[in-house]
Amino acid sequence: MGGVAAALSSLRPMPERPRLLVLNQYYWPGVEATANLLTELCEALAATHEVTVITGAARGLPRRQVRNGVTVVRVRSTTFDRSHLFRRGVNYTTYLLGLIWRAMVSKRPDLVVSMTDPPFIGSIARVVAARFRTPLLIILQDVFPEIAIKLGRLKSPAAARLLRLLIDPSLRAADRVVVIGETMKRRVEAKGVSPERVRVIPNWGDAASVAPMGHDNDWARRHKLAKRFVVMHSGNIGHAQNLDALVRATTFLRDVDDLAVVIIGSGARRSELVALARLLKADKVEILPYQDRAILSQSLSTADIHVVGLARGLAGYVVPSRVYGILAAGRPVIAATDPESETAQLVAKVGCGVLVPPGNPFALSAAMRAAHDGEYDLAEMGRRARAFAESESDRTIAVQRYRDVLHELEGAGARH
């Protein structure tokens, strides 16, 4: 009888996994930080949840596919170059129009999860969650419209008010809002979001796939960097990163013969940065496109030290996620940010780098020269960086924190 009972038990249907409906314009194969982070998160959550992502169009990819356990649905949307504000707005609009219909006819989820691309996607997510009477989780990577105002990209008070009307109510209505730092938590609470609903989960690196390598590696040799002292920026080349200061800093270091300043990435200000380097005859600056993630360990490890910049006044409105990959690669950091920024606090806490004021090329050049001349123990800073990456900022740790938040909401059940 025991054998029969065991056989019958094995025929019982497995309990259904909770269904997540995830909304964000950017996902794999996008090179955006949010695309990479969301892809890694969703693929990890697919082990315990049924995950569907509704994202924007990608050339050459099917409208619907299953990748690493995640169902990826791509709506019809434009894919114009995002460096031009109007074209980016068209991309946003076409994606949101496709998203509304596709999300509303989706299979009923147990949870709706939204990131913040475009910044006002939370308004759509709120409507979708209400339609299915399910909890809403918003994962906040940037605080809008404040970041655009601080950068001088949004000067119209009327437009700022409109954006706040589109964005802030969804944050206040969400069952949980995940932010990526304590300073950002304060910014969000200032918008009227209940502190009880806010959770802090920093972004992460992947200590399994990104690991320290020797400076003299294949990538370094291919780019003729193996025998040079390399200062690197790897990531978005946008308005928030304040990379003008890095290019200008090199003009104070013309006497450092073996110096190379390598800027890897793309973004709205890439062409301007190339033009600035030419104008200043900053011959030590090399600007390269995004590198394949498969060789990230090599490219990041080529640097003797990395620069992570953030424009003055942006602390808590955006957090450069690339710092976690740098830590995983076991490399030190020059944080050219306000002291209250998450990056500056992290570097000071871990002891993996030095802090300089943002937007100050001379101070940045002094830190670069000191690093080159051996005034810092770069090897020890790198060891601390890697140890922190393994123990505190690895993807597995962040994913478990997200699972804890999801379990809170799953226990709350449907909205009434």
Regions found by a protein language model. Name each.
Residues 264-265, 270-297:
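Nucleotide-activated donor-binding/catalytic signature segment of Leloir-type glycosyltransferases, i.e.
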Residues 222-241, 247-250, 262:
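Conserved donor-binding/catalytic core segment of Leloir-type glycosyltransferases
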Residues 123, 127-131, 157-179:
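Membrane-proximal helix-turn-helix segments that form the acceptor-binding/catalytic region
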Residues 370, 377-391:
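A short, well-ordered alpha-helix in the C-terminal region of glycosyltransferases
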Residues 57, 183, 201-204:
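Carbohydrate-associated surface elements
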Residues 2-71, 76, 396, 416:
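N-terminal subdomain of nucleotide-sugar transferases
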